């Protein structure tokens, strides 16, 4: 089930994740390396109707796809509640590409962003 959004996230190829995550960015002092932490609370990918193994998170937009394999499930009282994914960039072009995806994803989902100072 794919949507007509210009930017989307998928854990299973061809199936968009409707739950919008909290996203936290961390960068090195020189700005060249860093990571984005995605935290999904009760995502559809963990529902009982979803079959298959999660092998990564795909960030898809009009430019293509960014893939991270760093995905973990967090359990509360034995139930899978949170899905955590980490995307790491190692250079400025990768960061710039990620930010283009993030801006497109925010627009597609009616979101904004704020900086902690």
Swiss-Prot record:
Record has Thylakoid as a keyword: yes
PANTHER family for the chain: PHOTOSYSTEM II REACTION CENTER PSB28 PROTEIN, CHLOROPLASTIC, PTHR34963
Protein name: Photosystem II reaction center Psb28 protein
Family designation: Belongs to the Psb28 family.
Record-linked InterPro entries: Psb28_c1_sf, PSII_Psb28_class-1
Entry keywords, A to Z: Membrane, Photosynthesis, Photosystem II, Thylakoid
One GO term describing the cellular component: plasma membrane-derived thylakoid membrane
Entries under Pfam families matching the protein: Psb28
Subunit organization: Part of the photosystem II complex.
Membrane topology: Peripheral membrane protein
A single BP term in Gene Ontology: photosynthesis
UniProt organism field: Prochlorococcus marinus (strain AS9601)
């Amino acid at each position: 089930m794919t949507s007509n959004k210009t930017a989307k996230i998928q854990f299973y190829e061809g199936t968009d994740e409707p739950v919008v995550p909290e996203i936290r960015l961390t960068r090195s002092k020189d700005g060249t390396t860093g990571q984005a932490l995605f935290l999904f609370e009760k995502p559809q990918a963990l529902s009982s109707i979803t079959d298959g193994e999660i092998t990564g998170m795909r960030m898809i937009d009009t430019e293509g796809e960014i893939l991270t394999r760093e995905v973990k499930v967090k359990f509360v009282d034995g139930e899978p509640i949170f899905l955590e994914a980490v995307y790491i960039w190692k250079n400025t072009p990768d960061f710039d590409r990620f930010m283009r995806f993030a801006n497109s994803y925010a627009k597609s989902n009616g979101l904004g962003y704020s900086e902690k100072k």
